Amino acid sequence: MNRPFSGLNRTECVSLMKHYPLSIGILAGQWLRLGEYQQDLRALEQPVLHLDLMDGHFCPQFTVGPWAIAQLPQQMIKDVHLMVDNPWPVVQASVKAGAHCVTLQVENTPHLHHMLHWLGEQNAEVSGGTMPVLRGISLCPATPLEHILPIIEDVEIVQILAVNPGYGSKLSRSALLRRAAQVVALLNAAGKRDAILLAVDGSLNLEELPEIIASGVDRVVSGSALFRNDALADNISRWLTTIHSAK
């Protein structure tokens, strides 16, 4: 499913990524059913899998390490979000394990500029060849959006968190929509709107999806809501229908 990304440059990869508005939080599923999930995703033409790597320090939860990236089907796009206190070795290990997108938290990434430049020199294997590793930054709910500006030339993904990592506190719908609109305005002012994919992550539900997409968001990250009631294919279909109707 990731063959179309082979041989594309960064701008072309971002443009193609925007055709896939869902990044599916695979850790919300059952690891032993990956083969079954892959069949559903292939039928729905949804190649993007999201993995949250948490170390129990930046946020109180532990999840998985970079080893898990290599266990995912080769045909999928691995969208990796690092929430760790010492990101540099995890960044390197994630790329080595096959990550196609690596998103860093701006709040706890020393030498962020250096890491983004290093990522900008990396490629990831896809069916039929390679693609550039796409670089992302993620912002917690209270992080000023101005943190985007110093590295806006060095990223392809900007991700807004609707929740505080590892905690249940979530932005109100109005606050989330306002924040998304502010990022869109910031990207437009910098002439980077087309070159950057805007994502939202964090306990999203189907009811708020139309307004989120209408605000200018390109991709939503969802895990538990898509795996709810053991109905992955049906849930994804409903989300995609809602997303396409809102555009």
Q: Which sequence ranges carry the predicted segments?
A:
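N-terminal amphipathic alpha-helix/helix-capping segment at the start of soluble metabolic enzymes
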Residues: N2-A28, G35-E36, Q182
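Alpha/beta catalytic cores of nucleotide-metabolism and tRNA/nucleoside-modifying enzymes
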Residues: N2-N9, A185-V200, N205-K247
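Catalytic cores of alpha/beta
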Residues: E36-L41, N86-K96, A142-V155, S203-S222
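N-terminal active-site wall of soluble small-molecule enzyme domains
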Residues: H50-E125
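Glycine/Thr-rich beta-alpha phosphate-binding loop at enzyme active sites
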Residues: D55-T63, P141, L149-N188, D194-L198, ...
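Alpha-helix-loop-beta-strand connector modules within alpha/beta enzyme cores
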Residues: F62-H81, W118-S138, L176-L198, G202, ...
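Glycine-rich phosphate-binding active-site loops on the catalytic face of alpha/beta enzymes
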Residues: V102-H111, Q159-L171, S215-I236
